[in-house]
Amino acid sequence: MSFGRPPTFSDFKVSPPERGSFPLDHDGECKSVMQEYMNCIKYNRNDNGKCRHLSRAYLQCRMDKGLMEQDNMDNLGFKDVVDPASTETKNAAAAAAAYRAASQGRGAHSGLAVSYAGDTHGVERHTNSAKAGSGSAADESNRDANARANANGHVSRQDASYAGDSHAQSGTARLV
């Protein structure tokens, strides 16, 4: 191409995308699987090892919907992924489901063992007080050190525990 001359595209060569590059999911056909994976990643503090079964499901969805070429999962790096029927995977899936339920504004008592900061009825097993979750002296005496940190807005280190209101009825629960 030279200056002053109209551009020519004869030198332009079309090449296929590199392996791993595939079209965007404009219609949202696999959005729910992708969202579940992203929630799992957030819940596990960016430890993708606990969410590999979900990334495998996402790639399988993309292959099923024609958004990427069919390929063996071994070639995509999933040779060592544990079967979803295993206990650890079930626990991770349950935790991701609990995370998803909390992110959709459902209550802490929807059949899953989810606890919110300030919730005296959940996994923390604290005795009830008149001012549950308020941070009052009566409330603090019923809590252990981790629960006090939760009441002060710190990150909870318990399984399936989220910061927000005690029952997530206002829909403003903030996922940690």
From Swiss-Prot:
Motif Cx9C motif 1: which residue numbers?
A: 30-40
Enumerate the Gene Ontology biological process terms.
Answer: mitochondrial cytochrome c oxidase assembly
Q: Where is this region: Disordered?
A: 1-20, 124-176
Q: Which PROSITE patterns match?
A: CHCH (PS51808)
Which stretches make up the CHCH domain?
Answer: 27-69
* Pfam families tied to this protein: CHCH (PF06747)
Disulfide linkages recorded for this protein, renumbered to the chain, are C30-C61, C40-C51
Checking InterPro entries in the record gives: CHCH, COX19
Keywords (alphabetical) are: Cytoplasm, Disulfide bond, Mitochondrion
Q: Enumerate composition-biased segments (Polar residues).
A: 167-176
**GO cellular component terms listed in the entry, alphabetical order:** mitochondrial intermembrane space
Give the transmembrane region(s): none
- Motif: Cx9C motif 2; annotated at 51-61
Q: Where in the cell is it found?
A: Cytoplasm; Mitochondrion intermembrane space
This molecule's function is given as: Required for the assembly of mitochondrial cytochrome c oxidase.
Q: What family does this chain come from, according to its entry?
A: Belongs to the COX19 family.
| PANTHER family reported for this sequence | CYTOCHROME C OXIDASE ASSEMBLY PROTEIN COX19
Q: What is the protein named?
A: Cytochrome c oxidase assembly protein COX19
Q: Which organism is it from?
A: Mycosarcoma maydis
